[in-house]
């Protein structure tokens, strides 16, 4: 029936979030990449006609000129383009499953965001698309001392445990202003 074929064709056109983390049995293999001819902002200097070498998902070299390409590297010519470091979001509430606020008591320093990280939150993907590479996940402001934060490296398709940055410092959220008054 032609009507059924038309409906099926139309329904497959509109996918509003990526499938990568859903339905695949493994995460895509990291490839070797060299970005050349870029204007690179390092945070300390601006490098004109610079190159960045990425091997096995890690940046191994940043500098002026061209460098030896890693084996089987994909080469990206970034002439006229800019490359910057990833953005670190120091105050975020993404990737938290039903645990932003602990409002039962004024002090809840014993609770931890690490226990409620949601690795399937579509906002991880959206943050990555906007250049955010790491986030500090904080409790809300329903009480003055809301609990322990978590620092994650944004990686779409990973488990909650694999999002956590190794040997991260521990922090507790304090909210000593109008938010606490408004939420109670």
Where in this protein do the model-derived segments appear?
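Histidine-rich, glycine-flanked metal-binding segment
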Residues: 44-84
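Enzymes and membrane/adaptor proteins characterized by extended Gly/Ser/Thr/Asp/Glu-rich
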Residues: 97-116, 147, 153-155, 164-168
């Amino acid at each position: 029936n032609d009507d059924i074929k038309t409906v099926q064709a139309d329904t497959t056109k509109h996918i509003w979030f990526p499938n990568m983390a859903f339905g695949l049995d493994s995460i895509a293999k990291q490839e070797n990449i060299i970005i050349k001819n870029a204007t690179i902002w390092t945070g300390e200097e601006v490098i004109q006609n610079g190159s960045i070498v990425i091997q096995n998902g890690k940046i191994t070299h940043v500098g002026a000129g061209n460098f030896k390409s890693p084996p089987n590297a994909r080469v990206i010519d970034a002439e006229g383009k800019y490359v910057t470091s990833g953005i670190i979001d120091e105050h975020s509430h993404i990737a938290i499953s039903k645990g932003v606020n602990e409002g039962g008591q004024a002090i809840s320093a014993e609770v931890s965001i690490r226990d409620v990280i949601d690795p399937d939150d579509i906002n991880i993907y959206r943050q990555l698309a906007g250049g955010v590479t790491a986030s500090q996940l904080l409790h809300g402001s329903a009480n003055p001392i809301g609990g322990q934060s978590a620092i994650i490296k944004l990686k779409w398709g990973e488990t909650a445990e694999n999002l956590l940055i190794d040997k991260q410092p521990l922090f507790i959220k304090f909210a000593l202003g109008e938010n606490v008054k408004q939420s109670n």
